[in-house]
Amino acid sequence: MASVQKDPILQVETTCGSLLFELQIIWDEVGETETDRDQMLLELERECLEVYRRKVDQANRCRAQLRQAIADAEAQLAAICSAMGERPVHIRQSDQSVGSLKQELGRILPELEEMQKRKVERRNQFIVVMEQIDSITNDIKGQGELVHSEPLIDETNLSMRKLEELHCQLQVLQKEKIDRVETIRKHLCTLYSHCSVLGMDFNEVVGQVNPTLSDPEGPRSLSDHTIEKLGAAVQKLMEVKIQRMQRLQDLATTMLELWNLMDTPIEEQQEYQHITCNIAASEHEITEANSLSEDFIKYVEAEVVRLDEVKASKMKELVLKKRSELEEICRKTHLLPVSDSAIDQTIVAIESGIVDATMVLEHLEQHISKIKEEALSRKEILERVEKWLSACDEESWLEEYNRDDNRYNAGRGAHLTLKRAEKARNLVTKLPGMVEALASKTIVWEQENGIEFLYDGIRLLSMLEEYNILRQEREEEHRRQRDQKKLQGQLIAEQEALYGSKPSPSKPLGGKKAPRMSTGGASNRRLSLGAAMHQTPKPNKKADHRHNDGALSNGRRGLDIAGLPSRKQSMNPSEMLQSPLVRKPFSPISTTVVASKANIATTTTQQLPKNNAVNEISSFATPIKNNNILRNLEEEKMMTMMMQTPKNVAAMIPIPSTPATVSVPMHTAPTPFTNNARLMSEKPEVVEYSFEERRLAFMLQSECRLV
């Protein structure tokens, strides 16, 4: 009974039977039909089959998984053994009793774990060796620590044979690294020696080759490029050392020669004994620090330069003395001396040793003797030239003297000036003959010597020819001025014949002479055109203000600058209406009167004295009959001009004639008070001109002066 209870299948069957019996009882009570009962029983059987089928499938899958795990473990174990180059440790025997799948898997897994541990250890050995190989390779290639990636390992080949090959490769690289380190060390030692002798900074030189070499504790580049640059730096410093050694030996040789030449004392030579002792030394024998540095060579060069200066100082003094002698001779004979730049270049060449000073001195002696011979042949002509130049100076002084209007004024030393002027006139009369004689002498000299006679670098004949041309031009100018004065005299005579002679200026109306304002003779001469001035009454403040405003107008200022007369405004407006001769703008004007008036104005302006500060106020009258005749002539002339072509009209436009009495703007002084009736009787009649007419008159008047 106990065995039955222990059997689970029997227990299940018993349980199922009891449950089925209990189900029958329930169906009986319910009253289920047999068909329904059979159908329900079929469903129960079907459900039981499904449960069994699921359980069977699950068991099959578990068996397949165990078999796959065993196969995978065996494959991994075989791959590891193959990669490590060892014989597989798990080989299934066909005659061997096979246990369950779980037992077989349990036997394989420990072996697999053991082989995996061995593979990891072998792989780590490969990594260590390959990292060392990569490090040395990077040092040789000059990459240093730039590459930090893990080395690539072939997982399929981790055999001991491969590991031994890597160890051999590592040993070869280590040996090459040692050789490169030794080569770099030798180069660095050589560089240090050269830098010490040449006075250079070792770290700076090495840093230019490769910055890693200047750090003694850090890693250094062992690449071929670094070694090549080190070798090039060593070679370059060797060449610099040889060049400086040759320079120093040349300086020492020159120093010995200068010492022997100038008998330098032994005490002074002892200071540079360590330099002269290496005069025949080779490159390897010079090892003293800074013995070939730039500062030391400059120090020796400075001493050699000082000795050269001492040597050349006396030669320079001789050359300068000869040059001064040559310049003095050339100055006295009016010859062009040797240029200072050429002498300076010669002195520099002597100081540098390019030219022998003895040869230069001989050349200067020959040149001085040649200049002296030429000076003897030029002596007579030079004396005549000095006389001619002195006469030219007197001629210039005489011209200035003749242009002085005050030359005849009595004063201190006037009689001496007159005597000098008389002597100058006598000397000027001899100038043409003097120039002709000098030119003939010069031509003869040039024919005899075959060269041009130069006076301070200019040919003397050219100077004489230029002087003759200038003299002729001055004579023509004087002749033209005399003709112009003669013509002006004729015009004045015609004016006097037409208008009569100019009356003397009227005296001031008052008993007291009016004070004159000093405004400058040049301004008054410009404003005065030969017409008489009228006296103005003393204005009040209000009228004076109006007068000043009118004087500042643009039209009046333009006429004042042009030198033409402007209309004087009256103080009383009624006086303007009483003037019967006020002319409308652009009315006909007489050409003959205009020309005569312009000539009179020019002559009067030229004859005014320089010391006259203000023109006196005066007036003169012209008969009215003459004005009527002039008006008729002007109308006829204007009709003739209108018949001409436009091209000829501009040439025939007459200058506006100046009326008989014209008021010219000028600075006037106040006069004593007079009554208005007297002023009305004495006030001149004014003819009004437009601005265009006055400007045209000024232009034509300027053309007449030029002619």
Curated annotation (Swiss-Prot):
Q: Which GO terms describe its molecular function?
A: microtubule binding
Sorted alphabetically, the Gene Ontology BP terms of this entry are:
cytokinesis by cell plate formation; formation of syncytium involving giant cell for nutrient acquisition; microtubule cytoskeleton organization; microtubule polymerization; nuclear division; response to nematode
Coiled-coil regions listed in the entry = 49-84, 157-179, 269-289, 354-374, 464-486
Q: Which residues pair up as cystines?
A: none
- Pfam families per record: MAP65_ASE1
Low complexity bias: start-end ranges: 500-512
Region feature Disordered, mapped onto this chain = 495-574
The protein's site described by Microtubule binding is found at A410, A421
Q: Where in the cell is it found?
A: Nucleus; Cytoplasm; Cytoplasm, Cytoskeleton, Phragmoplast
Give all Phosphoserine modified positions: S504, S528
Give the keywords, sorted: Cell cycle, Cell division, Coiled coil, Cytoplasm, Cytoskeleton, Microtubule, Mitosis, Nucleus, Phosphoprotein
Listed under GO cellular component are:
cortical microtubule; microtubule; nucleus; phragmoplast; preprophase band
Q: Give the tissue specificity.
A: Expressed in all tissues enriched in dividing cells, such as the root and shoot apical meristem, foliar primordia, and young leaves, and embryos.
Q: Which InterPro entries match?
A: MAP65_Ase1_PRC1
Disruption-associated phenotype: Irregular root expansion. Defects in karyokinesis and cytokinesis. Cytokinesis defects before the embryo dermatogen stage and in roots. Embryos with enlarged nuclei, often containing multiple nucleoli. Some abnormal stomata with pores attached to a single side of the mother cell. Long root hairs. In roots, multinucleated cells, cell wall stubs, and synchronized cell divisions in incompletely separated cells. Normal anaphase spindle, but distorted phragmoplast. Abnormal formation of nematode-mediated giant cells leading to impaired maturation of nematode larvae.
Quaternary data: Forms a dimer. Binds to microtubules (MT) during cell division. Bundles polymerized MT via the formation of 25-nm crossbridges with centrally located endocytic MT, and midline phragmoplast MT.
According to its UniProt entry, what is the function of this protein? Answer: Microtubule-associated protein that plays a critical role in organizing the mitotic microtubule array during both early and late mitosis in all plant organs. Essential for the cytokinesis, especially in roots, by maintaining the integrity of the overlapped microtubules in the phragmoplast. Required during root morphogenesis. Needed for giant cell development during root knot nematode infection, where cytokinesis is initiated but not completed.
Tell me which family the UniProt entry assigns to this protein. Answer: Belongs to the MAP65/ASE1 family.
Protein name per the record: 65-kDa microtubule-associated protein 3
Question: Gene that codes for this?
Answer: MAP65-3
